[in-house]
Structures are given as structure tokens and as C-alpha cells.
């Protein structure tokens, strides 16, 4: 069973959501931190930035959010395997909304 929306498979849309969310949040945070009035309030992100691990963590998160569901989708063939795509979709949406918030802060800082 191939699930699709407007000709795009749900699987590819899930991976694109994760990619757009993680990359968008990372870039908007980097840009936002260039402004003196904007500070990072997430203590985990502050810890990662102070130790030079922030980019590595986001790259690993992107790899896991795409790699693990892709592996599971190909390893098992039962119909419920589509549920694993909730992980990259939800992660991508959460990071996408963080990106929107960051852009909002950047615009307000002008």
C-alpha cells in the first residue's frame, strides 16, 4: 500500500518535514543569535553551543529522524509500519514552529 498526497509519498513528505524543520530551526537560531537583544533560552542548546556540539547534534538528529524510520520501513512489511513516520513528522513540525518563533523574534528585533 503506497500512501501519497498529491503524488508525493507520505514517507518522502515526512523526511522533508524533518529536514526543513531541523535545518530551518538551526539556521534561524544562528541568525537570531547575531542580534544583541536575542538570547538562547534553552539550557540544552546553550550547553551544546558552549561545547561546540550544537551542529553535530542537529546533524545526528537529522540522520536518526530519517535513517531509523527509513530502515524500519524497509525491514518490516506489515501495514502498521507507516506509524514510524510520525517521528520525523512530529519532530520536523516542532522544529519548524521553533523556526517560525525565531523568525518572529528576529523581525521584532529590528
Predicted region positions:
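Hydrophobic alpha-helical segments at protein termini of multi-pass membrane proteins
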Residues: 1-110
Amino acid at each position: 500500500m503506497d500512501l501519497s498526497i498529491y503524488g508525493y509519498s507520505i514517507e518522502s513528505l515526512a523526511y522533508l518535514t524533518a529536514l526543513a524543520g531541523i535545518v530551518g530551526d538551526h539556521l534561524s537560531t544562528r541568525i537570531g543569535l547575531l542580534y544583541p537583544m536575542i538570547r538562547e533560552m534553552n539550557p540544552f542548546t546553550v550547553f551544546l553551543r558552549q561545547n561546540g556540539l550544537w551542529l553535530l547534534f542537529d546533524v545526528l538528529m537529522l540522520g536518526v529522524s530519517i535513517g531509523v524510520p527509513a530502515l524500519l520501513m524497509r525491514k518490516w512489511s506489515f501495514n502498521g509500519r507507516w506509524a514510524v513516520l510520525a517521528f520525523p513528522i512530529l519532530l520536523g513540525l516542532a522544529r519548524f514552529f521553533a523556526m517560525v518563533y525565531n523568525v518572529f523574534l528576529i523581525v521584532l528585533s529590528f
